């Protein structure tokens, strides 16, 4: 079984993970013999490292004789061996100062907290607040003419969130601003009291296209317009800080990889995969098959947006990030973001 390691192997695995996190270099048995809590013969440590490699907890680095943790090794470490660095408590005061800025709206506090998280850890920080897209219903779709060719469409949710989209008509097409008002009324009747996520599916359905078939010359533009509004709702609660620091990494120097990574962030895939987790979660890029990065880790933890909804705050960084420091900062931040409801 995965947790059936001897105490000595546990100490060696913990030492490899934490030394690799601190120095970013493969760890050899000679280095481990100098650690005060590993008072074992060099041959014994070397033998156990070979066994840990055979068991899949460590892997050989091609450029040196040292070893680095594997996905399995990191997983075991995070589940069984992690001890939190109590020295990070000196950083909590700066978190308290951000959280106590009650004059800001909650969204602004989250943004400031993410910026601080990025500064404290040096990793990209992300958060999803209230899941407006999946938890809000359309209350009303309104149409406001501006002139004979321009108008504004408003979508208002039952939670009071509002998005608008400007629309311009091509005068060469056989549809007037008054025709458009009629079709928006049809859409309003069809989508009122539907969840935003449900409405997005309806808009793209054959049924919807048949419903507005009379306005075929404007059909594609209308569908694109509503999808743009729904996309705005979906991204309204998404926050980032320190993305540029990830883009400075050598493995992201390829423009095509940068494009994929940014698209990944915009689609919120990195956080969506963990929204159903109730506690601290970790995911490796190798196991996700989502990110263009190799050896990437995503650490996330939930916080209470309100008594009925949870958000998620996370850091994205290399798999060798300093877990004893990063995890207690994440945990403290999540607890205190939840207290914004008090």
Curated annotation (Swiss-Prot):
Keyword Cytoplasm on entry: no
Entries under InterPro entries matching the protein: GAF-like_dom_sf (IPR029016), HrcA (IPR002571), HrcA_C (IPR021153), WH-like_DNA-bd_sf (IPR036388), WH_DNA-bd_sf (IPR036390), WHTH_transcript_rep_HrcA_IDD (IPR023120)
SUPFAM superfamilies: GAF domain-like, Winged helix' DNA-binding domain
Single Gene Ontology BP annotation: negative regulation of DNA-templated transcription
GO molecular function per UniProt: DNA binding
Pfam family, any one: HrcA
Keywords, ordered alphabetically: Repressor, Stress response, Transcription, Transcription regulation
Function (record text): Negative regulator of class I heat shock genes (grpE-dnaK-dnaJ and groELS operons). Prevents heat-shock induction of these operons.
Family named by the database record: Belongs to the HrcA family.
Protein name in UniProt: Heat-inducible transcription repressor HrcA
């Amino acid at each position: 079984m995965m947790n059936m390691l001897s105490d000595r192997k546990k100490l060696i695995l913990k030492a490899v993970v934490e030394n690799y996190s601190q120095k970013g270099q493969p760890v050899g048995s000679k280095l481990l013999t100098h650690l005060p809590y590993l008072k074992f013969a060099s041959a014994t440590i070397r033998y156990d490292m070979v066994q840990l490699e055979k068991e899949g907890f460590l892997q050989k680095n091609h450029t040196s004789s040292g070893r680095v943790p594997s996905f399995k090794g990191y997983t075991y470490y995070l589940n069984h061996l992690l001890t939190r660095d109590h020295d990070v408590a000196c950083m909590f005061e700066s978190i308290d100062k951000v959280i106590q800025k009650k004059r800001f709206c909650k969204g602004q506090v989250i943004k400031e907290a993410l910026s601080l998280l990025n500064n404290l850890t040096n990793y990209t920080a992300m958060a999803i607040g209230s899941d407006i897209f999946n938890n809000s219903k359309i209350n009303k779709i309104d149409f406001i003419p501006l002139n004979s060719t321009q108008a504004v469409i408003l979508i208002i949710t039952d939670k009071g969130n509002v998005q608008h989209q400007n629309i311009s008509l091509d005068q060469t097409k056989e549809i007037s601003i008054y025709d458009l008002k009629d079709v928006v009324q049809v859409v309003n009747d069809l989508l009122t009291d539907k969840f935003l996520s449900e409405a997005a599916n309806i808009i793209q359905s054959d049924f919807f296209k048949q419903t507005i078939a009379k306005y075929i010359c404007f059909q594609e533009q209308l569908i694109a317009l509503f999808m743009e509004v729904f996309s705005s709702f979906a991204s309204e609660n998404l926050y980032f800080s320190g993305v540029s620091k990830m883009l400075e990494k050598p493995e992201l120097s390829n423009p095509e990889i940068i494009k994929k990574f940014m698209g990944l962030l915009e689609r919120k895939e990195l956080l969506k995969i963990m929204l159903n987790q109730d506690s601290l979660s970790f995911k490796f890029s190798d196991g996700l098959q989502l990110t263009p990065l190799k050896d990437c880790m995503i650490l996330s933890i939930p916080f209470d947006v309100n008594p009925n909804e949870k958000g998620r705050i996370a850091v994205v960084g290399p798999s060798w990030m300093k877990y004893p420091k990063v995890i207690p900062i994440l945990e403290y931040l999540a607890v205190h973001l939840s207290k914004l409801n008090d």
